Amino acid sequence: MAKYDKADIERRMAGAVESLKSDLSGLRTGRANTSLLDPVVVEVYGAMMPLNQVATVNAPEPRMLAVQVWDKANVSAVEKGITKANLGLNPMTDGQTVRLPMPDLTEERRKELAKLAGQYAEKAKIAIRNVRRDGMEDLKADEKAKDISEDDRKRMEDEVQKLTDKYVAEADSAAEAKEKEIMTQ
């Protein structure tokens, strides 16, 4: 029974890139982005709940987020949750709406965020290389078990390497785009 599964390897590599893109979307640039509030949890009804389950988040202006709280009793809890999340945002309450103006990023903070984007990319590339290693080990095991020939193994190793190169390049381009976005705001 062959262990090597090209589709699984490609799926796992694509998953690493998607995870990177998700992580990068949470980095704050100068523009308002609703995904910035994804990690915020709010204590309501005696339980911790994600912000998106107690309110609607939108970006009415390029530098402002608005959180429309569904239950008026939860407004202060939402405000507290946003403050606790340490996002560097200063919530202002206006009835059932919590407004979050996006402060300007300092040059130092921009560099920190760009560096963080690079770290996220490196983690994704490590994950991709780990998937490649697993694929190569599976191919060697298949060859040892006489499921494939040496020529097949080498051909398939080239395929795995090409997939690796493709997804590493994708990770790099996603990180570069985010770094550029951060530095040019």
UniProtKB/Swiss-Prot annotation:
NCBIfam families registered for this protein in UniProt: frr
PANTHER family associated with the record: MITOCHONDRIAL RIBOSOME RECYCLING FACTOR PSEUDO 1 (PTHR20982:SF3), RIBOSOME RECYCLING FACTOR (PTHR20982)
GO molecular function: ribosomal large subunit binding
Keywords: Cytoplasm, Protein biosynthesis
Protein name: Ribosome-recycling factor
Recorded GO CC terms: cytosol
Family note: Belongs to the RRF family.
Gene: frr
